């Protein structure tokens, strides 16, 4: 007798966190994807197709500890531990680092799924469709601004119900501060997590009694809920710091000023705000980082930034890189009306 027959509920239902789209919803999704990919092709990006699985170690060495704990893991017949993708940026950069692709177009885009195990119960989505773009060989303030303009053009084509606000930070501000105070790696990990959560009280509790950490706490507290650049500069009191730290912080703030002022110079569909406590995946982000949020939605609808060391991890050759990903599922649920194929 076959002992592997599905339970009655398994015959009827799809596992929690996964979804089936019928013909009509699939048609609307296809139109949404073609609308976004049309902009990317016009901007000079070439499409690539990513593998569904990769070695688990590929993700573990690049993403943060909380993210790596949500990996689905299996062993293939050769004994290798493999996982469905939890980070498509990692796979895109890893793929392009292959020797045979180094002379091809280094501006690429992809459509793919990420899979994350969740402890939030049946309401949590475990499968997320993304469309993303990567530029290998370039980064910096000008390229970050170009990316933001691309995103604004994409969003302007979508009938979104709510306004999109993009939060811009730069992990180098935090890195410069913790390097100045010679913090240990475990302390940096704790601080980055608490800053991202905007938990100043816990930072003061942990580091308040440590010798010479008064300035550290003041600087880190300045990064929390301080969205105005001039106010942030005053709170940091840069002139009171060492020459090296003054130089580092001033340079980062000047680049951020440039992006913000350039953005505000004309009308945009996306609102831009500054938040230097936006500290994501310090294992590979190396400069500007951003997340986009729709009003009344707690989860980001887009993420991106600069990762100048990621390519080197897979090729041994240093190349700057930057990019972004849009969460298609969140976009779909935020449209006033479905996108219709204008050519039909």
Curated annotation (Swiss-Prot):
Q: To which pathway does this protein belong?
A: Amino-acid biosynthesis; L-histidine biosynthesis; L-histidine from 5-phospho-alpha-D-ribose 1-diphosphate: step 1/9
Task: Name any one Pfam family assigned in the record.
Answer: tRNA-synt_His
Where's it found, cell-wise? Cytoplasm
- A biological-process GO annotation: L-histidine biosynthetic process
- Keywords, sorted A to Z: Amino-acid biosynthesis, Cytoplasm, Histidine biosynthesis
Any one GO CC term of the record: cytoplasm
Q: How does it assemble?
A: Heteromultimer composed of HisG and HisZ subunits.
The miscellaneous annotation reads:
This function is generally fulfilled by the C-terminal part of HisG, which is missing in some bacteria such as this one.
UniProt cross-references to NCBIfam families, sorted A to Z: PRK12292.3-2
Q: What does this protein do?
A: Required for the first step of histidine biosynthesis. May allow the feedback regulation of ATP phosphoribosyltransferase activity by histidine.
The protein's name is: ATP phosphoribosyltransferase regulatory subunit
Organism phylogeny: Bacteria, Pseudomonadati, Spirochaetota, Spirochaetia, Leptospirales
């Amino acid at each position: 007798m076959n002992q592997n027959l599905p339970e009655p509920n398994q015959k009827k239902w799809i596992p929690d966190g996964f979804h089936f789209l019928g013909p009509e919803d699939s048609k609307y999704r296809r139109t949404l994807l073609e609308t976004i990919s049309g902009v990317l092709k016009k901007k000079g990006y070439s499409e690539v197709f990513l593998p569904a699985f990769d070695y688990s170690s590929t993700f573990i060495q690049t993403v943060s500890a909380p993210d790596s704990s949500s990996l689905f893991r299996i062993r293939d017949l050769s004994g290798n531990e493999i996982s469905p993708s939890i980070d498509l940026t990692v796979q895109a950069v890893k793929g392009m680092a292959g020797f045979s692709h180094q002379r091809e177009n280094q501006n690429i885009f992809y459509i793919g799924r990420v899979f994350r195990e969740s402890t939030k119960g049946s309401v949590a989505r475990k499968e997320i469709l993304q469309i993303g773009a990567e530029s290998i060989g370039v980064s910096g303030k000008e390229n970050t601004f170009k990316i933001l303009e691309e995103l604004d053009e994409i969003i302007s084509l979508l009938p979104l119900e709510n306004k999109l606000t993009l939060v811009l930070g730069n992990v180098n501000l935090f890195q410069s501060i913790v390097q100045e105070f010679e913090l240990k790696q475990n302390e940096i990990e704790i601080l980055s997590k608490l800053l991202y959560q905007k938990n100043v009280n816990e930072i003061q509790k942990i580091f308040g009694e440590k010798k010479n950490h008064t300035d550290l706490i003041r600087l880190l507290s300045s990064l929390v809920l301080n969205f105005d650049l001039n106010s942030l500069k005053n709170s940091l009191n840069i002139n009171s710091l060492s020459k090296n730290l003054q130089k580092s912080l001033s340079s980062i703030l000047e680049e951020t000023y440039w992006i913000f002022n350039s953005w505000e110079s004309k009308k945009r569909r996306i609102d831009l705000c500054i938040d230097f406590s936006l500290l994501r995946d310090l294992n590979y982000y190396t400069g500007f980082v951003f997340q986009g949020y729709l009003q009344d939605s707690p989860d980001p609808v887009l993420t991106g930034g600069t990762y100048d060391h990621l390519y080197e991890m897979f090729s041994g050759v240093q190349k700057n890189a930057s990019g972004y990903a849009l969460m298609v599922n969140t976009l779909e649920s935020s449209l006033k009306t479905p996108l219709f194929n204008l050519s039909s």
